[in-house]
Curated annotation (Swiss-Prot):
This is Phenylalanine--tRNA ligase alpha subunit. It catalyses: tRNA(Phe) + L-phenylalanine + ATP = L-phenylalanyl-tRNA(Phe) + AMP + diphosphate + H(+). Keywords: Aminoacyl-tRNA synthetase, ATP-binding, Cytoplasm, Ligase, Magnesium, Metal-binding, Nucleotide-binding, Protein biosynthesis. SUPFAM superfamilies: Class II aaRS and biotin synthetases, tRNA-binding arm. Its EC number is 6.1.1.20. It comes from Nitratidesulfovibrio vulgaris (strain ATCC 29579 / DSM 644 / CCUG 34227 / NCIMB 8303 / VKM B-1760 / Hildenborough) (Desulfovibrio vulgaris). One of its GO terms (molecular function) is ATP binding. The keyword Zinc-finger does not apply. Disulfide bonds: none annotated.
């Protein structure tokens, strides 16, 4: 067998075979047939030991040259077939079709409401203050006129870490911290998370609250009423009716709870012929608590209650969101149901 002639014949033979390969799979079959472990080149080289020792180097060098030529032919044909495949795919592409829109996220409804509330009070000249969620007993209770054993502490199911360290039950401690660091006039709101040991259809262990307060000379209940009425009508609409009811909070005196006309039934107490489940036919829903800052609180922060007066108020952000958007179950805010959350996109 003339091995040199056999080797030289492989190149034109492969060129004819590659011309018939119309897909990458057929091309791979040709590559295996010529360059595989049992391919044509390997079969020819299997006769190399039969040659005289002096001829083997010349045949081996020729085999390497042929192998390189075969490999180049395969690569060239592969490029051609890949380009043809890509062109075929592009020929089916219709640029006039609408594209696939990327998934769009949105802010959480609680975040939306909190930002709206902060925006309203920001326009009224209030600063935004923040502080620790892990609080001490003094700032959370004692400085707010709730000494140890005070019955008002029972109103809040507190999560204690140690005997004197706890998860804050309201954002009112920021009122104390801010007044300690600033001299009047002071006007600020304190948004943030608060924690209580409670969980049902209207309560969660963690929720969001905003505390607001103003301190200056001759601040009155009339200013409190005007501020909150303006705020509530901005958030819920200009036709919203607002009423103040006497109440009790240990850190304000006098104290009041604020109701607004029901957003669901429009203050009528019924929806069609059915009683309103939100306001329970009264036409009113409670929205926040407020009052004039107690003189004992002023004393704890070094303000002279004979010189300064001020008001404070607090509201739950989730409650505002529930009323604003007509949501019946507080827990829906925290269940991460995309079908629910995407409504606010």
């Amino acid at each position: 067998m003339d091995l040199l002639k056999e080797l030289e014949s492989l190149v034109p033979e492969l060129e004819r075979g590659l011309g018939q390969a119309s897909s990458l799979q057929e091309l791979e079959e040709q590559r295996i047939a010529f360059l595989g472990r049992k391919g044509r080149l390997a079969q020819v080289m299997a006769h190399l030991p039969e040659l005289a020792p002096a001829e083997r180097p010349r045949v081996g060098q020729a085999a390497n040259t042929v192998k390189q030529a075969l490999t180049e032919l395969f690569e060239q044909r592969k490029v051609v077939l890949e380009q043809a495949k890509e062109a075929a795919a592009l020929s089916r592409f219709d640029p006039s079709l609408p594209g696939r829109m990327p998934w769009r996220g949105s802010l959480h409804p609680v975040t939306l409401v909190m930002e709206e509330i902060c925006s309203v009070f920001g326009a009224l000249g209030y600063d935004i203050v923040t502080g620790p969620e892990v609080e001490n007993d003094y700032h959370n209770f004692e400085a707010l006129n709730m000494p140890p054993e005070h019955p008002a502490r029972d109103m809040q199911d507190t999560l204690y870490i140690t005997e004197s360290i706890l998860m804050r039950t309201h954002t009112s401690p920021l009122q104390v911290r801010t007044m300690k660091s600033l001299r009047p006039p002071v006007a600020a709101i304190a948004p943030g998370k608060v924690y209580r040991r409670d969980s049902d259809i209207t309560h969660t262990p963690m929720f969001h609250q905003i505390e607001g307060f103003m301190v200056d000379h001759n601040v009155s209940m009339a200013e409190l009423r005007g501020t909150l009425t303006s705020f509530l009508r901005t958030v819920f609409g200009g036709d919203t009716r607002v009423r103040f009811r006497p109440s009790f909070f240990p850190f304000t005196e006098p104290s009041a709870e604020v109701d607004i006309s029901c957003c669901i039934c429009g203050g009528k107490g019924h929806v069609g012929n059915e009683p309103c489940r939100v306001c329970k036919t009264t036409g009113w829903v409670e929205i926040l608590g407020c009052g004039m800052i107690d003189p004992e609180v002023f004393k704890s922060v070094g303000y002279d209650p004979e010189v300064y007066t001020g008001f404070a108020f607090g509201l739950g952000v989730e409650r505002v969101a529930m009323l604003k958007y007509g949501i019946g179950d507080l827990r829906m805010f925290f269940e991460n149901d995309v079908r629910f959350l995407s409504q606010f996109a």
